[in-house]
């Protein structure tokens, strides 16, 4: 529904359809695309050396469904992050020496993958991950899409009716500050939830679950997170110098066969990059300071007074502290 309020989504969440081959990811993208723009919609691939093609698509189309983004495409994480923040694309006009042109992203972007390589933490925080499993039985696509066409008018009518109700109610519910990075999405959902009489609690609970799903996506296959989780849970670490933590985690990673940073410097940089993921996965507040002689020290403070072992999502109080 936020798509009907462009002024309230300067930042954009990207639906990500994730799952094994044959789980219906492509069909899911096609269903949403056909619902919103009609039966001519179809998904498109993303090519390793064709960032210009992606820019052209998201600055000209109404909807773009990137399908099977499985291989490592160097520009894709940055492209997703730029799209999510609605950055204008500044390009040199073709066949000129120094003439610039700019384009704004306008499409609703979706992406699907069975082996995502775009799970950088800053990108993961901008995704709406939807996990798919293979069904027990398959239906032909023409049957699925025929059913959609029969009900498309009624569904779109209901969506537009709900959008009108929300537009009338939003002025009565001013936005609140929330501890959720994609503030436009978080604030819009909180205002809608409040306008429906449900209060903020249910929406904030959903944001907590979303944050957990995003952190799991970002940490999937990450040896640093896996090694640090083992060390933290086994030794209940509260505070430790980064160099000592590196050696402990490196020993676990070596024993378990995890991919792990080779140097303490790289380890320290990754700690900073993965800070938000570590907080959610370990259920802690991650803090750092400089000790004697400039030694970098990190702290893992149990959240809400517990031991942080379950890594549960944030509470309503956490989200509203702003």
Q: Model segments located where?
A:
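P-loop NTPase catalytic core of nucleic-acid-dependent motor ATPases
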Residues: 1-60
């Amino acid at each position: 529904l936020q798509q009907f309020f462009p002024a309230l989504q300067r930042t954009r969440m990207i639906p990500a359809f994730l799952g094994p081959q044959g789980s219906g990811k492509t069909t899911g993208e096609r269903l949403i695309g056909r619902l919103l723009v009609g039966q001519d919609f179809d998904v498109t691939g993303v090519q390793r050396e064709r960032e210009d093609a992606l820019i052209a698509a998201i600055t000209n189309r109404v909807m773009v469904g990137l399908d099977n983004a499985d291989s490592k495409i160097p520009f894709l994480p940055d492209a997703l992050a730029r799209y999510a923040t609605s950055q204008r694309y500044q390009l040199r006009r073709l066949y000129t020496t120094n003439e610039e042109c700019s384009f704004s992203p306008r499409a609703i972007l979706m992406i699907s993958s069975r082996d995502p390589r775009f799970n950088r933490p800053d990108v993961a925080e901008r995704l709406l991950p939807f996990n798919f499993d293979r069904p027990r039985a398959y239906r032909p696509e023409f049957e699925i899409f025929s059913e959609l066409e029969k009900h498309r008018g009624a569904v779109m009518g209901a969506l537009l009716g709900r959008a009108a109700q929300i537009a009338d109610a939003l002025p009565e519910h001013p936005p609140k500050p929330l501890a959720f990075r994609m503030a436009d999405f978080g604030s819009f959902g909180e205002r809608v939830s409040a306008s429906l009489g449900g209060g903020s609690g249910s929406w904030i609970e959903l944001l907590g679950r979303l944050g957990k799903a995003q952190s799991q996506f970002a940490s999937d296959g990450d040896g640093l997170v896996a090694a640090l989780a083992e060390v933290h849970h086994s030794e209940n670490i509260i505070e430790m110098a980064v160099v000592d933590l590196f050696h402990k985690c490196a020993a676990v990673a070596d024993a378990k066969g995890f991919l792990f940073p080779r140097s303490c410097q790289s380890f320290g940089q990754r700690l900073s990059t993965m800070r938000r993921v570590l907080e959610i996965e370990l259920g802690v507040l991650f803090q750092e300071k400089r000790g004697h002689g400039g030694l970098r020290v990190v702290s893992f403070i149990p959240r809400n007074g517990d031991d942080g072992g379950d890594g549960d999502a944030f509470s309503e109080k956490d989200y509203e502290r702003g």
